Amino acid sequence: MSRELILLIAGQSLTHACMAGMRLAAPLQALRQGYSEVAVGVLIALFALTQVFLALPSGRYADRHGLKRPVRYAVIAAAAGAGLAAIWPIFPVLCVSALLTGGATGSSVIALQRHAGRAAQTPTQLKQVFSWLAIGPAFSNFFGPFIAGLLIDGAGFRAAFLAMALLPIATWLAMRRATELPPVIQPPGERRPRAWDLLRDTTFRRVLLVNWFLSSCWDVHTFVVPVLGHERGFSASVIGTLLGAFAIAAGLIRVVLPMVAAFLREWALIFGAMIATGVLLGIYPLLQTPLAMGLCSVLLGVALGCVQPMVMSMLHQITPEHRHGEAVGLRMMVIQASSVTMPLLFGAAGAAVGVAGVFWAVGVWVLGGSRVAWLLRDDRKS
């Protein structure tokens, strides 16, 4: 692993850890202040909502200005968001903090992923780079909430918010040492493109579609497994262990991917992940014991954890270099919009047909969608 890649992983992890820690601390503070679960749900949604609207502009900005300037502005926004919560820990300010830290994290990730993709020289390197880079969020989703939780219990909410404000500053210390790549010049005579023009490419649409299918399956596990565990009388620690087993498996498979990247084909891995995910979602609600459900969660984590690096590798291969930022931004916009809306649909479906019905419906849906991944095979040949 190169020094440059280590800096990128560190930068992405620290900014993401700030948002992950705020996503734990801000709702807890709101609950302590007596706000309803509905208000807390709105607060949590704000972390993703900003990314939906900022993803495309952030991608275009990264295409024009490279790595360091977008990350610098993201660091300022994230540190300001967490810092405001430390100074005025009241609900309206917490909402502003959620918007700032969520948007800043999304913008910095787009710039970092674009830079990492440009630095890779071959398709194998692309798969390796994005596999290593995908480890960062898996680590920060543990590190940020862990530090925030310790500080809340030991020193209070203000200390936790202040610590989260320091993490983006550490990101900038890492990014200052990164090497800025030469700017990509738009081909002369080409009209200024619109982001939606990318969707005219059939392969691009298919890659986004399979990413959306599998991202929705990730959301099913995150939001529906706790409901299923509650129905069966599992304790909070058991439900947390199920979610933790899934996250650890998703992270560990990303450690393995760089070592075998040369032997993998993106379309084949994505197709296999969709088949495995559909089958596992069909089985999951039939399992009755925590041990069996935990094993199924691990297998789901392995299947879904290997998808993002392959999707990012394909996006960078099929998109013009001067539009990599837009492509990454468009992908993030789709995924974040899904993360905002899909839990609402799952909740409505669960009330109508039951939790098991949600698993089975999404399992059939993703199995049917696997045909899109199979068609990527022909796209890679052409």
Residue map of PLM features:
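Juxtamembrane intracellular "pre-TM" segments in multi-pass secondary transporters
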Residues: 1-2, 180-208
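Helix-loop boundary and gating motifs at the non-cytosolic
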Residues: 2-48, 205-210, 215-232
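Residue-level signature of mid-helix packing/kink "hotspots" within the transmembrane helices
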Residues: 48-56, 141-142, 247-255, 339-340
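Helix-to-loop junctions at the C-terminal end of transmembrane segments
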Residues: 54-66, 152, 253-265, 350
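Structural signature of the two symmetry-related core transmembrane helices
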Residues: 69-83, 165, 268-283
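Paired small-residue
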Residues: 92-100, 291-299
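Cytoplasmic helix-loop-helix junction between adjacent transmembrane helices
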Residues: 99-136
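C-terminal membrane-cytosol helix-exit motif in multi-pass small-molecule transporters
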Residues: 165-184, 369-377
